């Protein structure tokens, strides 16, 4: 629940969770590909719009990565520093080694755990799309607007505002709620079944690194510095590529776009 309400709070405050956007934009990208396939032009120009769209998506994700890493690192560092000032003890003095080891791709199953988080990002995108489609089909906003009790209690104008807000925000709220449930319960399920299951998301990893460094008083061998940096980059890339790849694959299947078109898309992105 802590994860779920945390993600909902991020969403409602207008902030962005890194790697969440790609799974939500795959349908738009698939539409762009479909339109490109219909163009009567040179082969190398068919997917120029996709390449530009993908480049914008990648740039926005890079900014989200940097923003999430800086914010999570700073907040985590501030919390452990504040805890030491308040209680007079370093609360991560005995756990810093595990926190940093978990961020290393050669000392832990970081890649697998990052891929699991990517799958959950993909599923949360599916949930958001499904809720949005159901709302449109069931005329969700109209039903809220015409609810007699709400109209009497809030008035017509406020009820319409509430309906519009719920229609816009509800898919994201439910999506983030379930994303939090998936992320927060994975390690517990793994422990119950005696499986090495866990999640790694770039935001959490950067926070763990901050706490681990504070616990170690920032005294690490140079190789560990390198590996935790490499691990952070790998986690972000795996989160992105798994969630985006799965979402794009589903979107392609729904529009009957052949798998052979992927090579043409890669070439277009490379040229761009």
Describe each PLM feature range.
Residues 1-41, 60-84, 120:
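Core alpha-helical transmembrane segments of integral membrane proteins
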Residues 77-93, 192-202:
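Membrane-helix interface motif
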Residues 136-272:
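Long, compositionally biased intrinsically disordered regions
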Residues 20-32, 90-94, 137-144, 199-205:
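Interhelical loop segments of eukaryotic multi-pass membrane proteins
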Residues 1-4, 84-119:
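Long, highly hydrophobic alpha-helical transmembrane signal-anchor segments
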Residues 32-59, 99, 151-168:
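Short membrane-interface loop/juxtamembrane segments of multi-pass integral membrane proteins
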Residues 1, 56-78, 111-114, 168-189, ...:
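Transmembrane alpha-helical segments and their cytosolic interface motifs
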Residues 1-24, 115-135, 182-188, 236-249:
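Hydrophobic alpha-helical membrane-embedded segments
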